């Protein structure tokens, strides 16, 4: 009778001990920071290479299945992918630095414009509580500080990219050999895995791939298309910083449902300092992009690969946003999909035993 409560207490104690160990580990940052630097230098390129290989492998297999020799199909995808990224960086980074620098210099002007708008609002809302006026002023100041810090960090990161050049240069080579020797890597992992875990482990990874693979690849393609369309639209209608706003729009579209509206906030803030026409252009562009994503791109490219109810996805997005902001919202859906597969396999194991 007491066996289950004792086991439960044991697991709780182990979890608390692990959490305490992690906490102490992070508190002693002076000791582990050199090791973290080495780990970061090794594992970040490795993780990026694994992710890129995961994206490119199905396309390579598709070309190989059409009769193209495997080595040639790898080279074609390799050259197209990294050649396209290289060309985009060569053309886009100088423009991006110019636009970021200009935006950073104009932030005080934008703040002055917003202060004028606030003064106008204050004059027409004298009956509002003073606390509400104070909160609006505070929100504007926090927004200004956030954008200033983000832009300065982006400029600094782009200008210091040479510091990470050697690390980044290893990624194309890692990707090539990962895609080329994928079967050898699978066999190695298979033999290194304990025999009792092999069947369940391969089934778990296969289910995760079935759940996430098409979603991730499709979502990234949708984001690329929407980001390009947004950037071109802002450029055609004369909105400043079209490359920055297009990038923000594309990246935030990774977030289901809320992404287009989050990506529209910077464009709206800038458009408000120009004219009502600019605001209308941004609003219309966002609604067109939202319509394209919901009715054309996502149904055909992404489909219902996740097999999760929209309510579950929205709850996951809210939880991710609360825990880690925008990054949490981006990672929330893939993490929930993996947790769903883990839960299914756990329940299956319980029923088998």
Curated annotation (Swiss-Prot):
Membrane spanning residue stretches: 8-28, 37-57, 77-97, 165-185, 220-240, 243-263, 269-289, 311-331
GO biological process: transmembrane transport
Membrane topology: Multi-pass membrane protein
Membrane keyword on record: yes
Coarse class of the protein's main subcellular location: membrane
Alphabetized UniProt keyword annotations: Cell membrane, Membrane, Transmembrane, Transmembrane helix, Transport
Keyword Membrane: yes
Subcellular location: Cell membrane
Record-level GO cellular component terms: plasma membrane
Family: Belongs to the autoinducer-2 exporter (AI-2E) (TC 2.A.86) family.
Protein name: Putative transport protein YrrI
Organism encoding this protein: Bacillus subtilis (strain 168)
Taxonomic placement: Bacteria, Bacillati, Bacillota, Bacilli, Bacillales
Gene behind this protein: yrrI
């Amino acid at each position: 009778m007491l066996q289950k409560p004792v086991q439960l207490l044991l697991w709780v104690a182990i979890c608390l001990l692990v959490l305490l160990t992690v906490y102490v580990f992070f508190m002693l940052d002076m000791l582990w920071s050199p090791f973290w630097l080495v780990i970061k230098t090794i594992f970040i390129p490795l993780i990026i290479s694994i992710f890129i290989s995961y994206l490119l492998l199905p396309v390579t297999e598709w070309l190989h299945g059409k009769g193209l020799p495997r080595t040639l199909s790898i080279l074609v995808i390799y050259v197209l992918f990294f050649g396209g990224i290289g060309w985009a960086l060569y053309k886009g980074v100088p423009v991006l630095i110019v636009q970021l620098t200009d935006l950073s210099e104009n932030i005080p002007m934008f703040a002055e414009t917003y202060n004028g708008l606030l003064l106008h609002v204050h004059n027409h809302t004298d009956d509002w509580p003073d606390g509400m006026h104070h909160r609006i002023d505070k929100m504007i100041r926090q927004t200004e500080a956030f954008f200033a810090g983000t832009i300065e960090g982006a400029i600094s990161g782009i200008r210091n990219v040479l510091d990470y050049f050697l690390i980044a240069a290893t990624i194309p080579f890692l990707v090539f050999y990962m895609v080329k020797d994928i079967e050898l890597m699978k066999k190695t992992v298979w033999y290194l895995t304990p025999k009792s875990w092999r069947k369940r482990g391969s089934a778990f990874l296969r289910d995760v791939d079935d759940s996430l693979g098409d979603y991730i690849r499709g979502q990234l393609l949708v984001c690329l298309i929407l980001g390009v369309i947004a950037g071109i639209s802002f450029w055609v209608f004369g909105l400043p910083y079209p490359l920055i706003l297009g990038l923000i729009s594309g990246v935030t579209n990774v977030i289901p449902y809320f992404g287009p509206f989050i990506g529209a906030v910077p464009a709206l803030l800038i458009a408000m300092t120009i004219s009502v026409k600019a605001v209308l252009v941004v609003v219309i562009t966002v609604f067109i992009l939202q319509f394209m994503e919901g009715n054309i791109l996502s149904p055909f490219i992404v489909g219902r690969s996740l097999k999760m109810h929209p309510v579950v996805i929205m709850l996951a997005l809210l939880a991710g946003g609360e825990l880690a902001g925008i990054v949490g919202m981006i990672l929330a859906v893939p993490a929930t999909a993996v947790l769903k597969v883990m839960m299914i396999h756990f329940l299956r194991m319980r029923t088998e035993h």
